[in-house]
Curated annotation (Swiss-Prot):
Entry function: Component of the general transcription and DNA repair factor IIH (TFIIH) core complex, which is involved in general and transcription-coupled nucleotide excision repair (NER) of damaged DNA and, when complexed to CAK, in RNA transcription by RNA polymerase II. In NER, TFIIH acts by opening DNA around the lesion to allow the excision of the damaged oligonucleotide and its replacement by a new DNA fragment. In transcription, TFIIH has an essential role in transcription initiation.
UniProt cross-references to Pfam families, sorted A to Z: C1_4, Ssl1
GO MF assignments: zinc ion binding
Domain VWFA: 98-275
Ranges for region Disordered: 1-37, 61-83, 423-461
Lineage: Eukaryota, Amoebozoa, Evosea, Eumycetozoa, Dictyostelia
Composition bias, Low complexity: 423-447
InterPro entries (UniProt xref): C1-like_sf, Ssl1-like, TFIIH_C1-like_dom, TFIIH_SSL1/p44, VWF_A, vWFA_dom_sf, Znf_C2H2_type, Znf_RING/FYVE/PHD
GO annotations of cellular component type: transcription factor TFIIH core complex; transcription factor TFIIH holo complex
UniProt name for this protein: General transcription factor IIH subunit 2
Keyword tags: DNA damage, DNA repair, Metal-binding, Nucleus, Repeat, Transcription, Transcription regulation, Zinc, Zinc-finger
């Protein structure tokens, strides 16, 4: 009897407590679900059970909708990175770039808001940027400038040797003092003012501090940059500075503030794409040499490292040996490149349009990728895209490979080749080639003509 009274009293206490506006009471911790009538904690309702959205087919599990959204976002980032426009639009870009990369090595790099530290994130991403920059712009040149202790120092000259730039960046590990924007831009200006005007002049400043220590006003430096057509862009690892944004706007550059490590990498990779050239820049023919690689049994010195080597590239103008391509001959200043280098730089002028997504489920038929021959039945992601020019269908992997690495649509290339073959293989009427003579005659559109004349000819088709 006493046990029942105790239970009733406890139940009455719980009922009465729910009437009070107590933040720690069960009324604020528990809430009723109208669907099944069960009580759930509030933190359980906020938690989304993402595993319930995964679909399962006969081949196993397929990715959730979140992964498909991430995939589509990646394709859109490629569009922003490459500046893809419509089929009929063309943007004039400089194929030969001269870029000064300025790194802020002040004491602010020791901050750990980016893991493991700003310096480690800077070192890793800049190394990836240098490799990607020369991969997409093989005939371009790059120089690295560091700023700390209110000074600026050039640690690598303008060249196309990626290994030399990476090693020079790793050797400059001291982080101390304050940066100097003016001194850094003056050093970059002294290097870029002597490069040919047919190549683009750019400065990329990775800024980590919130202050700058400059000897004088920056207005004269900004005017000098504008007179030399030097484009200055900033990537901020901290908050944006007004003076940096003003410099970027007046020199036709950009200014971005990173959100996290991934966004920092994306902002850097956007700079691998050549920017549009200024409208007043005139087209110019550039003299280049295409040397052949020669290997001899007797070593000879190279002009770049002054070491005895068996193989190298001989300059077609002065005959001096160089170790690698692309480079500039140190004797006659001739640009030494190879045909693949020009081909990799040429694709920036003619961008591949963004492929359209194909909803193959509504078509009630299976589609097949012409690149890897994967079918919609066996595909894991079940995402397919069609080229707006040739209307051929590609899977997700082939679509990313075409836009990120290949830069050519296989369907368009195959269609163009077939068109040329059919055009050359069709002839109407009789055609006389390799003939010399005088005569008068009329010819219609089908290739048939009548005329009188004297002459000799060979090759009747």
């Amino acid at each position: 009897m006493s046990k029942n009274i105790y239970n009733n009293n406890a139940q009455n206490k719980r009922t009465n407590r729910s009437l009070y506006d107590d933040e720690d009471g069960p009324a604020h911790v528990l809430q009723t679900n109208d669907e099944d009538g069960t009580n759930k904690y509030k933190w359980e309702n906020r938690f989304e059970k993402t595993w319930l959205t995964i679909d399962e087919d006969e081949h196993g599990l397929r990715p959730s909708n979140q992964e498909e959204r991430n995939t589509r976002n990646r394709r859109l980032k490629n569009k922003d990175r490459d500046g893809i426009l419509s089929q009929d639009q063309r943007v004039r870009r400089g194929m030969q770039r001269h870029l000064c990369l300025i790194l802020d090595l002040s004491k602010t790099l020791s901050n750990q808001d980016l893991k493991p530290s700003r310096y480690q994130v800077l070192l890793q991403n800049v190394e990836l940027f240098i490799k990607e920059f020369f991969d997409q712009n093989p005939i371009s040149q790059l120089s690295i400038i560091i700023t700390k202790n209110s000074k600026a120092e050039k640690i690598s000259e303008l060249s196309g040797n990626r290994l030399r730039h990476i090693q020079a960046m790793k050797d400059a590990i001291a982080m101390e003092g304050e940066p100097s924007i003016q001194n850094s831009l003056e050093v970059a200006l002294s290097s870029l003012c002597y490069v040919p005007k047919y190549g683009s002049r750019e400065v990329l400043f990775i800024f980590s501090s919130l202050t700058t220590c400059d000897p004088s006003s920056l207005q004269k430096t900004i005017q000098s940059l504008k007179n030399e057509s030097i484009r200055v862009s900033f990537i901020h690892m901290a908050a944006e500075l007004y003076i940096c944004k003003a410099i970027a706007e007046q020199t036709n550059g950009t200014s971005k503030v990173i959100l996290n490590e991934e966004h920092f990498n994306e902002s850097l990779m956007l700079k691998c794409q050549p920017p549009p050239t200024i409208g007043k820049t005139e087209a110019a023919l550039v003299e280049m040499g295409f040397p052949q690689q020669i290997t001899s049994t007797v070593p000879s010195p190279c002009i770049c490292h002054e070491k005895m080597k068996y193989s190298g590239y001989i300059c077609p103008r002065c005959g001096v040996k160089s170790c690698e391509l692309p480079t500039d001959c140190q004797i006659c200043n001739l640009s030494l490149v190879s045909s693949p280098h020009l081909a990799r730089s040429y694709h920036h002028l003619f961008q591949i349009p963004l492929f359209n997504e194909v909803n193959w489920k509504e078509l009630n038929k299976n589609v097949t990728c012409i690149g890897c021959l994967s079918s919609s039945e066996k595909s894991i992601l079940s995402l397919f895209f069609s080229c707006p020019r040739c209307q051929e269908i590609f899977c997700l992997d082939c679509d990313l490979f075409i836009h990120e690495s290949l830069h050519n649509c296989p369907g368009c290339e195959n269609k163009l080749q077939n068109t040329n073959t059919n055009t050359n293989g069709k002839t109407n009427g009789n055609e006389i080639t390799n003939g010399n003579g005088n005569g008068n005659g009329n010819e219609n559109e089908n290739g048939n003509g009548n005329g009188n004349g004297n002459g000799n000819g060979n090759g009747l088709h």
